[in-house]
């Protein structure tokens, strides 16, 4: 079962994000708090949204076991003059993989993108994550090999912001 995450899901989402960081060998970068996640998902200014996957037959609002999630937000294509959907994180517990949860999460996101008039649906994947790359290709997604990803964080971000 796939559904929109609600405020009560924040603790499990935070725990799953921690597991994702471990899987991606990025534990040292997981510094976000449960409180900040909840504020950004459900506060006055919502920066992102999330879907959760619950195990089959479970009542997700009472005792269902959340086995995966997708966290996403809108971006914008100036070339298309249309919004886009960006998948920040997709994670399914290792023991629950190959049961269709990832595909159902992505299908739900594709439907959201179409319903909202998005011109594209994008995400990134670590180069070493071959199982995910094969999965995405099987869905019909294509890698954007001609594009690179850049990021400013910490001191570099502050330094650029402080330039006179």
Whereabouts are the PLM-identified features?
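A short helix-loop-beta-strand connector motif used in the catalytic cores of GNAT acetyltransferases and
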Residues: 39-52, 56, 86
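A short beta-loop-alpha structural element at the N-terminal edge
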Residues: 1-15, 26
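Conserved beta-strand-loop-alpha-helix junction that forms the acyl-donor binding cleft
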Residues: 123-132, 144, 151-155
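Conserved beta-hairpin
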Residues: 48-70, 93
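Conserved GNAT acetyl-CoA-binding A-motif
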Residues: 114-124
